[in-house]
Curated annotation (Swiss-Prot):
Protein name, per record: Defensin-like protein 255
UniProt signal peptide: 1-24
Major subcellular site: secreted
Source organism of the structure: Arabidopsis thaliana (Mouse-ear cress)
Record GO cellular component, one term: plasmodesma
Disulfide bonds: C29-C46, C35-C53
Family according to the record: Belongs to the DEFL family.
Keywords: Antimicrobial, Disulfide bond, Fungicide, Plant defense, Secreted, Signal
Location of this chain's protein in the cell: Secreted
Gene Ontology BP annotations: defense response to fungus; killing of cells of another organism
Length: 80
């Protein structure tokens, strides 16, 4: 019984998160406060040129290379 209720709780929470994301992602807006209410976060703002909410962390993916690579190189360019 405990296992079933835990799985049900996980399923319901996943559905809530997905539905909030899809409903709030492309909202039209006129003020920053509208976007922050939809997102329930502080990083959202209204892009007034497009009249759409920009949620910051949800719209961007950081694909930069790390500053310190895992394989260190010597001054002559060799691996170790």
């Amino acid at each position: 019984m405990r296992s079933i209720s835990f799985k049900l709780l996980l399923l319901v929470s996943l559905l809530v998160v997905v539905s909030r994301y899809t409903l709030a992602y492309e909202d039209s807006c006129s003020t920053d406060e509208e976007c922050r209410r939809n997102c329930l976060c502080d990083v959202a703002y209204c892009d007034k040129s497009r009249d759409k909410c920009d949620y910051g962390f949800m719209n961007r993916v950081d694909v930069r290379f790390p500053k310190h690579p895992y394989i260190s190189k010597n001054k002559d360019g060799s691996g170790r």
